[in-house]
Amino acid sequence: MTKKSTIQPCLVCGQSSNSILFGAPSCRACGEFFRRKVISNFKIKNNCLGECSFAKKSMKPCQSCRFQKCLEAGMLEKMVFSRKAIYSISNFEKSILEELEEAYSKLEHGRNETFNPKSDSNPKFCSHEELNNTCTIDIQIILDNLISYFQAKKPMGKEQDDVLKMHFIVPFVLFDTAFRAIGKSSYISPDGTMFGGSYVEKLYQDSSNSKIGVNNGKTSREIMESYWKVSYKILKSEMELLQLDRSEFLLLSALIYWDFGLENQSDKCCENCNTIREKVLKELVKYERKKSGQNALRIAMIMGLLQAVPKALDVMKTCGFLSKIYNLRGSGCPLYAISTNSPPQ
């Protein structure tokens, strides 16, 4: 890392850059492209003759040529999983968005290391037992990688940190699950299996592992299917209409964590949350201005998604209540326990 701030071109696309990403001077867009391709471990198909031009801004290079250009620029795949993978050349403090990107990348890496999801042309659908087990493990991964970042960024004291944590976990899981399912016909579990969406019946289907005394899959599906459809419409459909991107998703996630007016939240914690929320909002405005020019309507529509999260949470709480009352399949979901302020068993 040099001490003097330097502006130099991205060695991949030629745009101005002041960052070293994965070992090479690169703009954030090319660095994020390289990171996604390495983490996905998906073989990029070469559909051209390797003649894509990076000089013509009007022509977008294919993924194969762009990835090869990243390697030629000096980007290293091993650095994607290194703590030193991304750093700024300048002395300026990292933006909250950059920190969120690093924290979420660690979360994704933790999921890949734990679940080892595989790309399959014939994806597997999970049962409610499998989904509950995966969710329990994933919550710990979220705690270790994302929530730990929030708590280190702005410590509030153990009691208030716990208040923010307990009010964040379930909304974030719902928000994250919907975001990762954009463009797909169903939700994707962190282990790569599918559930919900157009295939609710598969989640509650009878299996040899079903517990005795629990209502059959047909009954569970008939009661719960309408709630799945409502939840699908509240969050996932709205995200798809807005074409929410990763940076917008991360900044909104930060606003969900640093919320205010929560039960058992102290006045000081509310004040601190409002202070850091202002910084997050400024970064969102800056990001949208850079992405497509000043667009107040776009920002307003994106912020509207925050109003959808409590609605999705209410639907999930109703599902939890009905599951217990009617002894339905899936009643052991850890999100139900957390949403009623009880720790998951």
Curated annotation (Swiss-Prot):
Keyword Metal-binding: yes
Record feature DNA-binding region, as residue ranges: 7-82
The protein's name: Nuclear hormone receptor family nhr-176
Biological processes, Gene Ontology terms: regulation of transcription by RNA polymerase II
Knockout-associated phenotype: RNAi-mediated knockdown results in reduced egg-laying in the presence of the xenobiotic thiabendazole (TBZ). Not affected by 5-hydroxythiabendazole. Reduced expression of cytochrome P450 cyp-35d1; expression reduced further in the presence of thiabendazole.
Main function: Nuclear hormone receptor. Binds to xenobiotic ligand thiabendazole (TBZ), in vitro. Involved in the up-regulation of phase I detoxification genes, such as probable cytochrome P450 cyp-35d1, in response to TBZ.
Pfam hit, one: zf-C4
One GO CC term, this protein: nucleus
Keywords for the protein's UniProt record, in alphabetical order: DNA-binding, Metal-binding, Nucleus, Receptor, Transcription, Transcription regulation, Zinc, Zinc-finger
Region annotation AF-2: where it falls in the sequence: 331-342
Chief localization: nucleus
One GO MF term attached to the UniProt entry: sequence-specific DNA binding
Domain of life: Eukaryota
Leftover remarks: Thiabendazole (TBZ) is used as a broad-spectrum anthelmintic to treat parasitic nematode infections in humans and veterinary animals.
Gene3D superfamilies cross-referenced by the UniProt entry: Erythroid Transcription Factor GATA-1, subunit A, Retinoid X Receptor
Keyword Cytoplasm recorded: no
Subcellular location: Nucleus
All copies of domain NR LBD, residue ranges: 92-342
Zn finger residue spans: NR C4-type: 10-30, 46-65
